[in-house]
Amino acid sequence: HNGTVPRDHWLEEWEKESIVKFWYKNPLEGYRRCTYMMMDQDIVAVSPSSVYRVLSKAGLLKRWSKKESRKGSGFEQPLAIHEHWHIDISYLNIKGTFYYLCSVLDGCSRYIVHHEIRESMKESDVEMVLQRAKEKYPAARPRIISDNGPQFIAKDFKEFIRISGMTHVRTSPYYPQSNGKLERWHKTLKGECVRPGSPLSLQEARELVEKYIQHYNEKRLHSAIGYVTPMDKLEGREN
């Protein structure tokens, strides 16, 4: 058969075994992402529904999935890269000490433009994170999307945004899921990187997160952008 064309009507035993084996190695990826990863790696070429059936029969899939509310989903989706940059702050617990992770995510490509882990995250720290993101893409004039945290409502931050040639919009306090892309990213990072990696120091955490973000940006296929990597999407290689 043509190995590049997914089949849905029959599977050979070796293909079923390969699917199950691949799932055990990548249990956090989800069956759809695994389908495209297996195609990319020339393991098997079958449809997502076939992968779902094989994994369901093997008892490997959860029977439920949490549906996200569409209510207050916020802004229209960006049509181009560097149109929307989402910024958010999250806590990282490293051996009982809390540090601050601030990430900047491109809304179109899901690419992590910049991130920093710091011992404090005042308004001036957030400015520095955004400034370094801008230095990577000097021509970008994104709309910055944030929540209503004190760093983002400060007068100095508003002035920084104006001087930098960017614009800023804050999510509704009642519908913070408008910044859900970045909140999901932070949840994924903690679940797949920080907690399993159990870093023992701030420096170790920084190295661990840096390595994971490189994998996420350059290797991991993203379901929301058509199962290409964020870097492929950012650089126009999705077709």
Model-derived regions: residue spans:
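Basic, flexible linker segments flanking DNA-binding modules
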Residues: 1-84, 175-176, 229-238
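C-terminal domain-tail junction helix/linker
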Residues: 5, 162-164, 188-239
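Active-site beta-loop-alpha junctions of metal-dependent nucleic acid enzymes
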Residues: 97, 115-139
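Acidic/histidine-rich, metal-coordinating catalytic segments
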Residues: 139-154, 228-231
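RNase H-like polynucleotidyl transferase catalytic core
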Residues: 143-148, 163-181, 197-202
